[in-house]
Amino acid sequence: MLRISLVFVVIAALFQSQAILAHSEHDKARFVAETGKDTGKCDQVLRPCKSIAYAVQQANKGDKILVSSGEYTINSSDELFYLKSALVPIYGGYNRFDHFQTQSPDTNTTELKNIPLDMAEPLRQQGFVIMADGKSLFAKDSAESKALQNKLASYYTLSEKQVGVDCVNGAAGSFACNNIDLLAHMPLNDFSSRPNSANDIWGHVDLNTGDEYALIGLRNGVAIVNVTNPEDPQEVGTIRGLNSTWRDIKVYQHFDESINAWQAYAYATIDGASDFVTIINLNQLPNSVSLVEKNTVVTKAHNVYISNVDHTLNITLPGLTPSLQLIGSNRFGGAFHSYSLATPSTLTGLANNYFGSGYTHDGASINITDNRKESQCDTRGDSCTVFIDFNEKEVKLWNITDTSATTLLGTGEYNDVAKSNQYVHSGWGTEDNQHIFLHDEFDEKDGGLNSTVRIFSIADLNNPTQVGQWTGPTRAIDHNGFVRGNRYYMSNYERGLTVLDITDPANPIDVGFFDTYTPSNNPGFNGAWGAYPFLPSGNILVSDIGSGLYILKDRTLESNQGKISFTASSISASQGETITVNVQRNNATAPDQAISVNYQLLPGSAKENSDYTPAAGTLNWPANDTTEKSFNISISTDTTSEELQEEFFVRLSQPSNSATLGKYSYLTVNIDGLVDSGSISFITAETTVAENQGTLDIALARQGSSAGAVSISYLLSSDTAIIGEDVESASGTINWADGDSAEKSLQVNIIDDSENEANESFFITLSPVAGSKLGVNTQFTVTISDDDSNTAPVVTLTENSEVNTGATVNVTATVSDNESDPMTYLWQQTAGTNITLTNATALAASFVAPSSAGDITLSFTATDSKGLSSSKSLTLTVVAAPVVLPPPPIENESSGSGSIGYFILFMIIVLSRKRLK
């Protein structure tokens, strides 16, 4: 009786689950059947769609497509390439009569026709039968076949590394383009973690060295790539994390006077999995990166943003205080909330740090310094920080100048597409803080529009008003965009990168693109996810979901009115002098308009007022004038003769009348002083090591300057661990040559005794040699974890169960450990027909069941850092699923209730055959 009751509950749940999922942006199933119709959203089991291509275009990121038994002919390249999507996976082997409940490819034969042979095996693994009868479109000698073959060949180049390909006659190799060159393409299979998809991207310039980096979100972590040589990108390291479709990344950099060096941290959020906020230490670049912590202020968040910073240098804007916003998190209903970066290696909540109602999907900020700060922000300071809240069905403007007294300023909406087809996704503000560009992620897919970017005037912060829009030539979805000068750089999904001229913000003009997704330009979730146009070099970073990292060169900046630029990337200044900074109007072929540009000084290691006099202003060129313009900066006098070399920055912005920003839009001003040789410190402050580990390597880094030779000495000292009894005595000197910034290491030998004892610690302390300087971590604590009292981890597996032949099977283990030691995992097959395990070194693995019935036995082993392990086995019985027949037809009206009864009885029988897990 209990079993039958449970079955009735399951049947009831079938009719409720889809309504529940309808409130979620992702993680829904879409259904396809031979007898379906290509209407609606394909998310109702009783109303499946007919074609795979249509269903994919209704899906959101993270959804999956379930295909019922039948024959499906692939007649377009669109469907062909959607079958390879990692973001919206497609599975065959389902049955519409059991409501797509169980995958059974051997029973529910799902045939695909017109599939190239090299795509056959992966699709078989997804539950499809491939009809290889020699009649594929790819075997025909027709124009259509040749076009498909060319598209397929172009698609395969997406998995190949490419460098230095100029855009000529609308193409850069296999990539369609206009005014954008390919400097380098780093495909997903070049990343060390071997991810199957990528997501968002951000950039970083290390102000200690000038090196440039890409930080790209991957399905399984965040990779940091050195792009200083843009034609030879090199991965520095990857910080691994849980698998997820969604990651977002931002960087904050600050100058640490105690070590006279710039310090930088990256903050990565995750959605779709509970992996907290990943804080990454970027201070060992270019040698390595490391995890600081998984900060638990939230379990997950869709996006992250840092306000009051310059997005090229990732440093604080003059006179402002940076704060970090977590967006779309599991707290506060998804409303954004702010955190202090006073201690950048962690997150500290700010008072009253969440507000309003609704879910913030993404955010940006602007700083108002004109009369609106008093008349509309009611702020009496130098500026008003306005947070732009992209809130699903509207954009909201908030005054976050004082995060403890945040107020709503205004709300903007639009009505050119039905509310049900809207999703206010993201956007950015113009450099003059007068307009916002807004992206809607659903208006193409659900509203039937071509790519559409809406422009809002915020001249009245209390009443944001749409004043224009850009409509693209394709239906590709516009995703994320950023303003640099009078260009708008936008990830445009299947169209790749799109660049708009926003000289007239209300009427943008398409001036360039680079198509990172070669098969199509449909409103699907393939192609370019993110873009970052702020590197000092001017190179553009693009992340593509299926093909990885692109480094691009912008050729949209050529203008008859010229390019405005500093004469070099840096200049030198002496203490106490007034320097002249020159700005050029270059390459002006028809300078018939007056132009202007703004300049602003940004503090670095040199501080405004104490080291230089702050300045900001506008430079003007009359029509037909191409002479250099200049402004002066006063450098303060060093009264102590003890100041080290310092620097600050000058940036150009807001070029007018179609002039553009040139190669050098940022200038570093280096003030002379004493030469610094950098500082030496341990990379981390502590570690725990197993007593039976043997030799322990401990890394040290030279941070800041690498000028001159430096040395440090080190010495071990006892705490609860005794030198000579628990660890061998050691001391020595470590040297760095002039120009050497490589990481060094020292070794200590742990003594493994046979006593049962508590954890014990000892210290390694650094000392300067001949005037060298120490950094932050001058003492390193080593905790020895006793292996004699160690207990093995405890492994729990799911119960033995039945699976259908040909089905995709997921197996999951849980592990606990009394000592909370780091773990490694391994799934292995010990009996049965051979299978291939995916993610065999993770807690959750998967495989495709064989086509023959029988038992499959798997073993899972968890091993702790001290070498103790535990294993458990799991037996899965592979069975041929029963054939599910359609319910009896309804003969007439009077027999309708009887048919429903038969149908319910039929569903009870089907579901009761399944083993409850």
Could you tell me what each predicted segment is?
Residues 556-792, 883-885, 889-891:
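Short boundary segments that mark the start of a structured unit
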Residues 900-917:
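A cross-kingdom C-terminal cell-surface attachment/processing module
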Residues 21-54, 71, 137-140:
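Right-handed parallel beta-helix/beta-solenoid
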Residues 61-89, 93-98:
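N-terminal extracellular ligand-recognition/capping segment immediately after the signal peptide
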Residues 822, 867-873:
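A structural signal for beta-strand boundary/capping segments at domain termini and interdomain linkers
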Residues 102-567:
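Feature marking well-ordered beta-strand scaffolds used for ligand recognition
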Residues 828-847:
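Surface-exposed, flexible coil segments in extracellular/virion-facing regions
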Residues 820-826:
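Solvent-exposed loop segments of extracellular immunoglobulin-like
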